[in-house]
């Protein structure tokens, strides 16, 4: 099973796929971010929304979900945010939901779809923010780093 308890942080788990840690989440403390790149993403989020009224509802699309640590953090930091997560690994999503359930009314909706297909069905100008955090092993899937996909994101 890809969810591995973290012995240093009771209640927290690593998501390990293909021998690599893909995500780390402590559902009781969503503000606790362990991976450095996730901390950096949180700083970008804070900076990018510094001028947006905290009461204003924003919409976020996540390409990749794993343990949903970034969506959980956003729901903690900015309650009321509407979030759609495109995560094609149905088995992983089911296990995460079973062992690490989302808080009630978190605003997080997980779609069992890859990022490219998920973004293609979104209305233009749907999202205020897109988080690309998808991996196939240690790499971002090639179809998510093309000029065509980036053009699709900005429509």
What do these predicted regions represent?
Residues 1-18:
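N-terminal auxiliary segments of SAM/dcSAM-dependent transferases
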Residues 9, 31-155:
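The AdoMet/dcAdoMet-binding core of the Class I SAM-like
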């Amino acid at each position: 099973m890809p969810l591995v308890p973290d012995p240093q942080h009771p209640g927290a788990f690593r998501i390990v796929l293909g021998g690599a840690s893909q995500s780390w989440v402590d559902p009781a403390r969503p503000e606790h971010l362990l991976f450095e790149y996730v901390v950096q993403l949180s700083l970008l989020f804070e900076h990018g929304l510094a001028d947006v009224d905290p009461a204003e509802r924003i919409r976020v699309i996540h390409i990749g979900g794993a343990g949903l640590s970034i969506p959980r953090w956003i729901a903690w930091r900015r309650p009321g945010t509407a979030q759609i997560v495109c995560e094609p690994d149905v088995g992983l999503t089911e296990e995460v939901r079973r062992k690490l359930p989302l808080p009630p009314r978190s605003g997080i909706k997980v779609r069992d779809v890859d990022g490219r297909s998920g973004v293609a069905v979104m209305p233009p100008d749907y999202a205020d923010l897109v988080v690309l955090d998808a991996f196939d092993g240690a790499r971002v899937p090639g179809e998510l780093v093309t000029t065509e996909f980036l053009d699709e994101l900005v429509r």
